[in-house]
Amino acid sequence: MQKYNLPLWRVRALIAAGWEIDAHTITHPDLTAVDDAQLWREVHGSRVALRRMLHVPVEFFCYPSGRYNAHVIDAVRRAGYLGATTTNYGLARPARPYELSRIRINGSDGVVGFEHKLESVAP
């Protein structure tokens, strides 16, 4: 494991506290630039590894660096994920479960910054 990864006991503590754990590949490649075999290892293999280690459902995927295309979406769908998040800013739309937008919150945002981000996407 890389030095910035959480120890397994901390991940289990997050799960016990109600956090959901989802997949993000094994080696963080640009999935639009890898061959089919590596694409499958990254997408399916990360799900299998997390389920094996943590004994929890792994139902969503996050595209590394936000890079994806129709071929990558197809692999994510075939691997059994219910949806995937992108780096696109905005509210998630249920009509596009494999292209879910999100609002990135940083530690430096503070309460006012958090409120501003929510207001910027409010319907």
Describe each model-derived feature in a short phrase:
Residues M1, V11, A16, E20, ...:
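C-terminal active-site subregion of NodB/CE4 polysaccharide deacetylases
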